C-alpha cells in the first residue's frame, strides 16, 4: 500500500513540537538584582537602570528605624535626606519602572541603627514605610511621589524578633507588594529565619559571601552548591545567588565570572526556585563589568 504523503506531512507537523518538548528541558532564565545607593561615585539610579543589566534595583538603605527612633534614609554621597533633596530620584525611579525594572527600598544594612522592640513597633514602622515610600500618603516622602515596588529586608544586626510582624504588616497593606530578603548563607539565618518561614517573601537573595562555610573558595564550589541546595527547601518562593561584584566588594566569596557561568549557574539553574543572581553592589559592578560578563548566562 502506498503511503499518503499529505497525511505524513500533517503528522510530522504535529509531532515536531512534541519532539522539542521531549528533548529540551524548559530554561530557568533569570535576572540580576543589584544594590544601589552606598557610593556616591556609582552614578545615578537612572544610570544603573540604563545599563539594561538589572531586573531589580534595591535602594540602600533605610538604616535607622524602630524603637522610637526617627527613620532615616542613608544614600551615602547621592543626596541628603535632612534637607529633602533626595526627591530628585523620584523621576529616576519612575524611569526605571518604565523599563520594567522593579525598584525596592532596602532596610537595614551592615552598619545601620535599627531594631523592632515589639509587634506594635513593627506595625508603626510598616505604617511609616507604606506612607512614605509605597502606596500611602505623607507630606514628607523622602524620595518624592514615586511609589516603590517593594521592600527588601537586609537585616544584619540585632535580634531576629518581629521581622515576621513587619512582613505581615507590609503585606497587609497590599498583598501584591514585593517582599525580598537578603539573609546570610548559614542556616538558620540569625536575623531573618522566622520572617522567611512565614512564606511571605517573594524572593530571597542569599548572601553567599563573607561566610566561608557556605561560599566559593579557591576553586571549590562544593560548599556553595551544598548550601544552595539546602536553601531550596526553605519557604522562599524564589532564590537568587548573592555574590560580590568584584574582589573589593566583600572580604571573601568572590566568584570569577567565568567560574560562575561555567561551574555554578549550570548546576543551580536546575532548581525550580532559581531566580537569578544578586550583586553587591552597583559601584563595584560598574568598576568590574561583572553583570555584563554574566548576563548572557543568568
UniProtKB/Swiss-Prot annotation:
Name the residues annotated as catalytic in the UniProt entry: 156 (proton donor)
**Enzyme Commission numbers on file:** 3.2.1.14
For this chain, one GO molecular function annotation is: endochitinase activity
Q: What class of enzyme is it?
A: hydrolase
| Location of the protein in the cell | Secreted, Extracellular space
Q: Name one GO biological process term.
A: polysaccharide catabolic process
Write down the chemical reaction(s) this protein catalyses.
Random endo-hydrolysis of N-acetyl-beta-D-glucosaminide (1->4)-beta-linkages in chitin and chitodextrins
Disulphide bridges: 49-96, 79-86, 185-214
Matching PROSITE patterns: GH18_1, GH18_2
A Gene Ontology term for the protein's cellular component? extracellular region
State the conditions that upregulate or repress this gene. Answer: By ethylene.
* Keywords assigned by UniProt, alphabetized: Carbohydrate metabolism, Chitin degradation, Disulfide bond, Glycosidase, Hydrolase, Polysaccharide degradation, Secreted, Signal
The UniProt similarity line reads: Belongs to the glycosyl hydrolase 18 family. Chitinase class II subfamily.
Q: What does this protein do?
A: This protein functions as a defense against chitin containing fungal pathogens.
Q: What is this protein called?
A: Acidic endochitinase
Organism listed in the record: Phaseolus angularis
